[in-house]
C-alpha cells in the first residue's frame, strides 16, 4: 500500500513538473503568472534573463539581444512584451488553448480591467521542450518582427 501511494504521489509531482515545462499552454500560463506588474522585470531585461532562456527559443533570445543593443538609441519596444499594451498593469488572469499544433491563443485580463488576446507561436526543440518563438498581437507587428527590424 505504501509503495502504491508513493508511486501515485511521485507520478502526480513529476507529471505537474513535466506539464509546466513541456506543454505549450501550461508554459504560456506559467509565464503569464509572472507578469503581474506590467513591466519588464522579472521576465525581461536588456539581455536575456534566465526566465527568457527557459520560456523563449534561442533564436528569439538572439533577436532580443541584437535589438536591445539599440535600446539606448531609441525604445525598441516600450510596452509589456507579453501583452503588447502600455500601462495595463500586468496580467491578472489568462485563459489559453492550443489553436494549432504550434500556436497558443491566450485571452488575458489585465490589472487595469482591459482584455487582450494574443497568440504565442511555439517551436518544439529536438530535446522535446516547447519554447515561445514569437508573440503575435492583433493590429500591430509581432514582437519578433519588431525585434528583427530593430536589430538590423
State the predicted function of each range.
Residues 20-72:
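Core segments of small alpha/beta cavity-forming domains
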Residues 1-4:
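Positively charged n-region of N-terminal signal peptides that target proteins for export
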Residues 56-114:
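Surface-exposed, charged secondary-structure patches
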Residues 121-123:
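Short beta-strand edge segments in extracellular beta-sheet folds
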Residues 14-17:
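N-terminal signal peptide c-region/cleavage motif recognized by signal peptidases
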Residues 10-11:
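Short, linear, compositionally biased motifs with a strong N-terminal bias
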Residues 70, 97-103, 107, 112-117, ...:
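Low-complexity, intrinsically disordered terminal/linker segments enriched in charged
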Amino acid at each position: 500500500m505504501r509503495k502504491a501511494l508513493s508511486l501515485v504521489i511521485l507520478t502526480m509531482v513529476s507529471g505537474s513538473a513535466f506539464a509546466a515545462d513541456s506543454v505549450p499552454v501550461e508554459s504560456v500560463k506559467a509565464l503569464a503568472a509572472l507578469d503581474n506588474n506590467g513591466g519588464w522585470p522579472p521576465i525581461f531585461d536588456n539581455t536575456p534573463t534566465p526566465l527568457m532562456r527557459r520560456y523563449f527559443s534561442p533564436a528569439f533570445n538572439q533577436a532580443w539581444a541584437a535589438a536591445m543593443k539599440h535600446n539606448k538609441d531609441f525604445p525598441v519596444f516600450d510596452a509589456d512584451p507579453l501583452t503588447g499594451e502600455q500601462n495595463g498593469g500586468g496580467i491578472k488572469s489568462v485563459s489559453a488553448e492550443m489553436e494549432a499544433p504550434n500556436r497558443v491563443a491566450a485571452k488575458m485580463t489585465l490589472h487595469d480591467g482591459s482584455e487582450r488576446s494574443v497568440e504565442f507561436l511555439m517551436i518544439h526543440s529536438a530535446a522535446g521542450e516547447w519554447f515561445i518563438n514569437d508573440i503575435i498581437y492583433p493590429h500591430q507587428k509581432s514582437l519578433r518582427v519588431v525585434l528583427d527590424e530593430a536589430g538590423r
